Amino acid sequence: MAVVVVNSATASLLAVCLVFMAVGLCTGQIVDVKFPSCRCERELTPFAIKSAATQLTSRNPGVVNLYCFEIGIVNSGSGACYTEPASQNLSKVSVYAQAAQRDRLSAFGVLLAGAPVSNMTYLTPRWDSLNMTTISNLNFSKTQANGTRICLELFKPTTINEFCEREGASGSFCWVALFNDNNCVPPNSTVVISKRLCCPRFQSFLSP
């Protein structure tokens, strides 16, 4: 069993989930959370987060833990967020985090598919007021994104179970959202959006 993608449009999300299940990317509990807090469509794009997160050896094992989410590709889908040219690149990744844990995040890591952990690129995390921590300007094609890992470097003894926000839901998982654009227009903003913004989100569980 893997993950579920959810918002208030439960029927639509269940349909999306069935597509993900076909490639081993979707399962779990149907819940709704206030993430991401952006005016964007939480529908299927060519990109997904695999359900099993992993812990890798960190660059400083005595000080930090390293937890990673792997990007997968959905090879069959429909709808504007899947088919439009603007959705064929992955621009941004966000993780839903607990406000009290902000100072526990040392860095984001990006590990390209097939590369050794020693080749990890470390980036300074960016936060917004809605408990999203984000890396942007990725501009990954499907080929570049497939198998790439997005990692959280957390100061010990913090684990991703403690770091991630679940809004009271049971289970040990993180919410991760994938965006086709760097922008996050707040839900109540009256700004006119000139392109379709897509932001499916996924639950990813730490493997034993």
From Swiss-Prot:
Residues listed as glycosylation sites in the UniProt record: N89, N119, N131, N139, N146, N188
Leader sequence segment: 1-11
Coiled-coil regions, chain positions: none
Domain of life: Eukaryota
Keywords: Glycoprotein, Signal
Biological role stated in the UniProt entry: The sexual inducer is a glycoprotein synthesized and released by sexual males at about the time they release sperm packets. It is one of the most potent biological effector molecules known: it exhibits full effectiveness in converting asexually growing males and females to the sexual pathway at about 10(-7) m.
Listed name of the protein: Sexual inducer glycoprotein
Species of the source: Volvox carteri
